[in-house]
Structure formats: structure tokens, C-alpha cells
Swiss-Prot record:
This is Urease subunit alpha. Pathway: Nitrogen metabolism; urea degradation; CO(2) and NH(3) from urea (urease route): step 1/1. Carboxylation allows a single lysine to coordinate two nickel ions. The gene is ureC. Its cofactor is Ni cation. It comes from the Bacteria.
Length: 567
């Protein structure tokens, strides 16, 4: 039997079982757990390579073969870190296994035929497209920025750069919901809209859900009173949608105890649960320990650095329509920015108490940095806290699975769309992101949306090859014309489907129906299930989890930063 060195094999076909890969310039390493390919029967495209007629490519018709195969990919997902070929059919993940020609090769379950396209994923990492569950729809150009960062699904609300949208993630009322659903139909990203949940009577909330809202947002700027919270959650229980909440920073209508009492044992998604983005001062972070609370962070506080506090004050004044000449407005802003709770947030993420990360796009958050900042936290926590059991200093597989779940499967489960997106699993939309390991979490090699390339780095269009400088991200064919509608999904609640809303609005995109929102609990948050007793000292703001004081120094230097953004 012919043999080649492990290094030569990795150079040709990508890493295999036991090989380790560093994630960009972080301190994180992953080790390949399983290889679905067959040694000696690997498929690869190119001159003199395997995927040729009668060799790695068979004679089957399109109905029997894949539309697209990603060869020799290193998949990093919440369920594993494995090497495999990925078969895509009709825009969905069809098979994860061994590609090739079953007529002449053993073990093939990803058949390649004359109708099959190939993306070479040797030496590349493949992850699921990110799910950003805290979007202010302030401008449509956010979509380009998000796609170029590896995010393929938006959950949020808004109507453009209106004052209400600049502060709150709400698309209020049936008329605006209809217009935003029609606008979203032309954007090459999956979208679900949140309606305004601040009401003390249920009728106006029910009509928003029937008009297409997949969830309701309670925001203190509209009045997150106990009455509004109770009413909103009552409608959510009735109509199986999620509720997201930004609680009362000023504690005017009640404190954290009153909000938790109003919520009861009902599931709720708490936004920026640390509090700098808003919420009961100084102890909204306590909510992260509740079994029915699904806590997320927004990315400006992630990770805690020497610049975090200074940046937040200016952001807050703009986003919440505050006046720096009014003492009460300044006091409101300062009450939300606490070094101690921001530092504790990173540690609670590493412990698995905080389950999700998100952006808060253009409203105290950066839409293109959800993926990047999540991994910066993971890096910092490895440096500060060492390996997470059962990891060793040689690999960080468990920590990597915990952190990737925060912006993929967990927000998808939270908002009832986990059956369509959020992981690299058979049957789900082929929303996939390819990364060169050196650029992981920073700059994707290309992004697939529903099986088509939607964005990618591209060189000089008049060049004789695709790679001459200047290279920058450009929209691809998946972002154009009717291809958008065949590869993107609009999410709707069952109540909107029952009334035929998609047909009424002439929506041309794929439709996904949210379900199971009310059954999701903290134990369902993949790799992020911890429910500690969290205590905050009202005078010093020190945070303890199950009695442990949570403190860490701010970072003065980070990976995934200036090294990658000279241009």
C-alpha cells in the first residue's frame, strides 16, 4: 500500500483524525474527531484529479446526484468537529459523508454526476451561517456587511432610520410589517420580524402576529412595565411566538424582582443581559440564572477591553435619543455602564450561563462583528481561565462547540427556526460559510445562501484570473434576481400562514414557519445550559455566580483585530 506523510496528506486533502488546526491568530485549536472520507478514495477536482468522468464522477442523472458537493471540508459545528464531503440538493444539505462515483468507489453516499458542481473545501473550515437575533433594521446595507462576516439570518425589527427603530427592534403594526416583509423579499438573507410588544391589552399584539411578526419585543423606551410584560407573554403563549425584552433601566415600574415575577415561569429571550445595552440597573444580569430565561449578549461589550466603557457612553446618548446637556439623561447613561458586570459577562459566557451572542446593529452594536467578537471572548477566556473540561492545552474542541452554538443553533432554537437554519445538519438550508483557517471568524472565503454563492472575495473583474488585486467582497449570483427568492427564507408565524399572508403580500421567497418557541428552556441551549445563582452587590457592582466572585482584567490586545484590517 502506498503511503504519504501526514503533512503531505493534509496539504492535499485537508486535515484528518488527530490533526490539529489553529483558528486564525487566536489561542484556540481544534482537533479532528472523525473523518467520513475513505483513505485512498478521496475526491478532488482539477486537472489530473479524481472528479473526472468515469472516475470520481459517475453517469447518474441529476435526480440521483448532488447539485453541489463541498469536498474534504473540516466542519465545525455544535455537534462535532469532523472531516467530510457535504452534498447539497435543491438548496438544502442532503448528505454529510463520502462523495464520489458509487459505480467504482466504496462507501459513497454523496454521488457526483455530470450535473454536480464542486467547491474545493480541502484545507477550509465550514460552519453554519450565523443567526443574529438582535437586528435593528436601520438600513438595508446591513445585509451586505452581515453576509460578508458569515451571518445569513436576521431576527429583529424596524422600519429604517426612524427614531423608534434607532432605539428599539420593533416593526410596529400591520402596515409596517407588510411593507418590511415586502422589502425583505428582495434581500439575500433570511429574515424574521419582531413586532412591538409593549401593550397592556392583547388585541394589538395579536393583530401584529397575524400580520407576520414572528415574535414581540418589549423595550423600556416603549414602557416595559409588569402589565405589558404579562400581557405580551400571555399572547406569546397563545400564539407560539418568542418574546424578547429590554427591561427597565431606571427601575421606574419595578425592579428585577418585579420583572421576574411578571414573567413567571414563561420562556423569554433577554437581550444584552449584562445591562450596558439596557436593563434593570445594576442587576439585570441576575436573570441569566433562571431556567426560563434565554440570555444573550450584544457585541459592544464583548470582550471586555480597556476601551469598552469609554465607547459605550457616547453610543448610548445617540441611540436612545438622550441629551448630554440634561443631567438626568447623563445619569441614565452612566447607570448602565458598569465595569464589574461587563467583566463578569465574559466569564458567564465561558461558563455556559449566557447562551447567545448578537449584534444590536447600528443601535449600540456592530452588525459585522458578531462572529468575530464571539471568538475574541473565547480566546480571552482561554488565556484567563485555561482549558474547559474535557479540553486540554492541546485542543479546545468543547470550548469551540460552546461558542459556535452561541451565534448559530441557540438563537435559531430560541426563535423557533432551528428546524430550518442554525447548524450543518441534513435537511437544513445550505447556508454555509467557508473559511481559510488563517482567516477564521474574520473574512470568509465564500458564503453560500441556500446552496448558491451569495458573496465572496473577488479580484479585478478585468483580470485574466479571479485573484488579481484589488480583492474585495462582491455580491454573487445568489444575491441577484429571482435566485434570491429561491435561496432565502422569510419566517412567519402560524397565525400569518393560516390567513394566507404570503400570498396576500405576493411574497416570492421560501417561507419558514416558526414553531416550538414556548417549549424552549435554558436546558435546551446547546452547550450553554448553566443556571447559576447570580448575585450583584448594589454598592460595588461585584458579581458572584454560585458564590464565586467573577473578575477579570480588561484586554489590552486582541486577536482577529488590526492584523486583518489594514485595508
Amino acid at each position: 500500500m502506498s503511503r504519504i506523510s501526514r503533512q503531505a496528506y493534509a496539504d492535499m486533502f485537508g486535515p484528518t483524525v488527530g490533526d490539529r488546526v489553529r483558528l486564525a491568530d487566536t489561542a484556540l485549536w481544534v482537533e479532528v474527531e472523525k473523518d467520513f472520507t475513505v483513505y485512498g478514495e478521496e475526491v478532488k477536482f482539477g486537472g489530473g484529479k479524481v472528479i473526472r468522468d468515469g472516475m470520481g464522477q459517475g453517469q447518474m442523472l441529476a435526480a440521483e446526484a448532488m447539485d453541489l458537493v463541498l469536498t474534504n471540508a473540516l466542519i465545525i459545528d455544535h455537534w462535532g468537529i469532523v472531516k467530510a464531503d457535504i452534498g447539497i440538493k435543491h438548496g438544502r444539505i442532503a448528505v454529510i459523508g463520502k462523495a464520489g462515483n458509487p459505480d467504482v468507489q466504496p462507501g459513497v453516499n454523496v454521488p457526483v454526476g455530470p450535473g454536480t458542481e464542486v467547491i474545493a473545501a480541502e484545507g477550509k473550515i465550514v460552519t453554519a451561517g450565523g443567526v443574529d437575533s438582535h437586528i435593528h433594521f436601520i438600513c438595508p446595507q446591513q445585509v451586505d456587511e452581515a453576509l460578508n462576516s458569515g451571518v445569513t439570518t436576521f431576527i429583529g425589527g424596524g422600519t429604517g432610520p426612524a427614531t423608534g427603530t434607532n432605539a428599539t427592534t420593533c416593526t410596529p403594526g400591520p402596515w409596517y410589517l407588510a411593507r418590511m416583509l415586502q422589502a425583505a423579499d428582495s434581500l439575500p438573507i433570511n429574515i424574521g420580524l419582531l413586532g412591538k410588544g409593549n401593550a397592556s391589552r392583547p388585541e394589538a399584539l395579536r393583530e401584529q402576529i397575524a400580520a407576520g411578526a414572528v415574535g414581540l419585543k418589549l423595550h423600556e423606551d416603549w414602557g416595559s412595565t409588569p402589565a405589558a410584560i404579562d400581557c405580551c407573554l400571555g399572547v406569546a403563549e397563545e400564539m407560539d411566538i418568542q418574546v424578547a425584552i429590554h427591561t427597565d433601566t431606571l427601575n421606574e415600574s419595578g425592579c428585577i424582582e418585579d420583572t421576574l415575577a411578571a414573567i413567571g415561569d414563561r420562556t423569554i429571550h433577554t437581550f444584552h443581559t449584562e445591562g450596558a445595552g439596557g436593563g434593570h440597573a445594576p442587576d439585570i444580569i441576575r436573570a441569566a440564572g433562571q431556567a426560563n430565561v434565554l440570555p444573550s449578549s450584544t457585541n459592544p461589550t464583548l470582550p471586555y477591553t480597556i476601551n469598552t466603557v469609554d465607547e459605550h457612553l457616547d453610543m448610548l446618548m445617540v441611540c436612545h435619543h438622550l441629551d448630554p446637556s440634561i443631567a438626568e439623561d447623563v445619569a441614565f447613561a452612566e447607570s448602565r455602564i458598569r465595569r464589574e458586570t461587563i467583566a463578569a459577562e465574559d466569564i458567564l459566557h465561558d461558563m455556559g450561563a449566557f447562551a447567545m451572542t448578537s449584534s444590536d446593529s447600528q443601535a449600540m452594536g456592530r452588525v459585522g462583528e458578531v462572529v468575530l467578537r464571539t471568538w475574541q471572548v473565547a480566546h480571552q477566556m482561554k488565556l484567563r481561565r485555561g482549558p474547559l473540561a474535557p479540553d486540554t492545552y492541546y485542543s479546545d474542541n468543547f470550548r469551540v462547540k460552546r461558542y459556535i452554538a452561541k451565534y448559530t443553533i441557540n438563537p435559531a432554537l430560541t426563535h423557533g427556526i432551528g428546524h430550518e437554519v442554525g447548524s450543518v445538519e441534513v435537511g437544513k438550508l445550505a447556508d454555509l460559510v467557508l473559511w481559510s483557517p488563517a482567516f477564521f471568524a474574520v473574512k470568509p472565503a465564500l458564503v453560500l445562501k441556500g446552496g448558491m454563492i451569495v458573496t465572496a472575495p473577488m479580484g479585478d473583474i478585468n483580470g485574466s484570473i479571479p485573484t488579481p488585486q484589488p480583492v474585495h467582497y462582491r455580491p454573487m449570483f445568489g444575491a441577484l434576481g429571482a435566485a434570491r427568492h429561491a435561496t432565502r427564507m422569510t419566517f412567519l408565524p402560524q397565525a400569518a400562514m393560516d390567513r394566507g399572508l404570503a400570498e396576500e403580500l405576493n411574497l416570492r421567497s421560501l417561507i419558514g414557519v416558526v414553531n416550538g418557541c414556548r417549549r424552549v428552556r435554558k436546558p435546551d441551549m446547546v452547550h450553554n445550559t448553566l443556571q447559576p445563582l447570580i448575585e450583584v452587590d448594589a454598592q460595588t457592582y461585584q458579581v458572584r455566580a454560585d458564590g464565586e466572585l467573577l473578575v477579570c482584567e480588561p484586554a489590552s490586545e486582541l486577536p482577529l483585530a488590526q492584523r486583518y484590517f489594514l485595508f
